[in-house]
Amino acid sequence: MNPAIYLSCLVVFSLLLLGKVNAEDDDEFRTEKQRLLRVYGDSSVDEATRYRNVDDLVKFYDKYSTLLPWKPDLTQRAQDLLRRYKEETARAVLVDGAPAQGGFWLPLVKLLIVQLGVEIASEGFKRAIES
């Protein structure tokens, strides 16, 4: 096979594959964003559910932070809190594969992340209403 044809086929195939991956990422982004908005934006959701979803919120922010159009101060607060959360979870002592009971900082950081999630969700709803 001619190397030019082979190379062009490879480029086309790569672009198609890349487009499919981006479309899947867009669907995943949209689905997870909606789920987290329901968790943190709905006042009828209990605090325990919000605490259980902190890890999902952290993973979502890590993966999609560049796609989130937040104000600079909100972005900075989120980055600071998530850095602190990761530091505290890295320090957590595991007993038989589960985190040990007690501790002061990790629950406090989780509380701040839950409050930030609620604030971000309300900001998102405000923007949606204004549009």
Swiss-Prot record:
Major localization class: secreted
Family to which this protein belongs: Belongs to the Turandot family.
Subcellular location: Secreted
A single GO cellular-component term on record: extracellular space
Any GO BP: response to bacterium
Segment forming the signal sequence: 1-23
Alphabetically ordered keywords of this record: Immunity, Innate immunity, Secreted, Signal
Family annotation (InterPro entries): Turandot (IPR010825)
Gene of this entry: TotM
The keyword Secreted belongs to this UniProt entry's keyword annotation: yes
Disulfide bond residue pairs: none
Domain of life: Eukaryota
rRNA-binding keyword on record: no
The name this protein goes by in its record: Protein Turandot M
Function field: A humoral factor that may play a role in stress tolerance. Requires Mekk1 expression in the fat body to regulate response to septic injury and consequent immune response.
Taxonomy of the source species: Eukaryota, Metazoa, Ecdysozoa, Arthropoda, Hexapoda
